């Protein structure tokens, strides 16, 4: 790892945010009831979306809750790029059903909507009140996040992205209190993801890792996570797209996206996400694809200031850089990103 502390955070205090407990592996979703009970939850609101319902994943989870004789309520109307209206509707269900905890089931949209409910349940007001950094004052209800995609890492982050329907912008809420208490990444729940979604979420994870790695807030801890994430994405994403039933590839991508989440949750993101969020908020475009399309262009822009880092990215992504100058090696990273994107079928542009 090529980290020069003198050029980073020597002498400064840094922080590292992750869930209290994380479960990864085939069948770990069966532990939802026991984990929820261990943190004080008795009747959760399950926040999910129609895609999860139609795929039969919600029934898989409710069967687990039923077997444990755990009561629950369901909000299944979350949309891609969840809105302030989604949060308000879900919170009404939470109150009406007298829930005391939250289980989010899905990808980034369901997790973000559920986090929004957590803000209102713990602190009151409207979701708009929490736009910005660490605006909440009181704890969340007990919260278990169950992931079904390998990309957003929302099941383990302190980020909550909600579309403000009046302004047509995505509100960025960054708050350590919305970090789930328990994160669950069960590759069994990801087997049915179609190739296009697998590709988009996987490239979202790569974007997280790359942006965190070249961030001015990067630390040795985030570097370690970002490097391993990029290595695993390069090893497993093509396989997961080609064969969704490839258990090793699915589990590899579980780890990859989680590691990328650990990186960006603590080193933050960059211009790719800044632009992708606005495309999602204004045009309702899919987040993962926007990131994948923008990543090579923003990386080329950033490359001139971080050549050595991009040279390292090139090597992690399988490029041979022996004998090349720092500039030449850094260009190989852009080529590797483009190749991976093309290999998994990401569109070449936004049109």
What are these regions (language model features)?
Residues 159-267:
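Carboxylate- and glycine-rich phosphate/diphosphate-binding segment that chelates Mg2+/Mn2+
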């Amino acid at each position: 790892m090529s980290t020069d502390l003198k050029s980073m955070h020597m002498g400064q205090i840094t922080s590292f945010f992750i869930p209290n407990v994380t479960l990864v592996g085939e069948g770990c979703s069966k532990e939802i009831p026991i984990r929820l009970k261990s943190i004080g939850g008795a009747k959760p609101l399950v926040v999910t979306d129609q895609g999860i319902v139609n795929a039969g994943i919600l029934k898989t989870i409710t069967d687990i809750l039923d077997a444990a004789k755990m009561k629950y309520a369901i909000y299944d109307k979350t949309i891609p790029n969840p809105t302030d209206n989604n949060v308000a509707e879900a919170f009404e269900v939470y109150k009406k059903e007298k829930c005391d905890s939250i289980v989010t089931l899905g990808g980034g949209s369901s997790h973000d909507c559920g986090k929004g409910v957590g803000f209102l349940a713990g602190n009151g007001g409207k979701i708009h009140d929490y736009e910005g950094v660490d605006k909440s004052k009181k704890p969340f209800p007990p919260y278990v996040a169950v992931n079904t995609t390998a990309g957003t890492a929302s099941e383990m982050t302190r980020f909550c992205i909600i579309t403000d329907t009046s302004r047509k912008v995505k509100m960025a809420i960054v708050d350590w209190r919305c970090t789930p208490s328990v994160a669950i990444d069960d590759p069994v729940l990801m087997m049915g993801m179609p190739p296009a979604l697998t590709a988009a979420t996987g490239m979202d994870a790569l974007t997280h890792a790359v942006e965190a790695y070249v961030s001015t807030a990067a630390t040795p801890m985030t570097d370690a996570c970002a490097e391993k994430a990029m290595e695993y994405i390069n090893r497993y994403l093509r396989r997961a797209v080609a064969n969704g039933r490839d258990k090793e590839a699915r589990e590899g991508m579980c780890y990859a996206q989680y590691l990328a989440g650990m990186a960006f949750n603590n080193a933050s993101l960059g211009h790719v996400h800044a632009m992708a969020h606005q495309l999602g908020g204004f045009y309702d475009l899919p987040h993962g694809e926007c990131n994948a399309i923008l990543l090579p262009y923003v990386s080329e822009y950033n490359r001139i200031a971080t050549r050595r880092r991009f040279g390292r990215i090139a090597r992690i992504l399988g490029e041979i850089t022996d004998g090349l100058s720092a500039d030449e090696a850094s260009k190989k990273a852009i080529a590797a990103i483009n190749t991976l994107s093309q290999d998994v079928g990401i569109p070449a542009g936004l049109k």
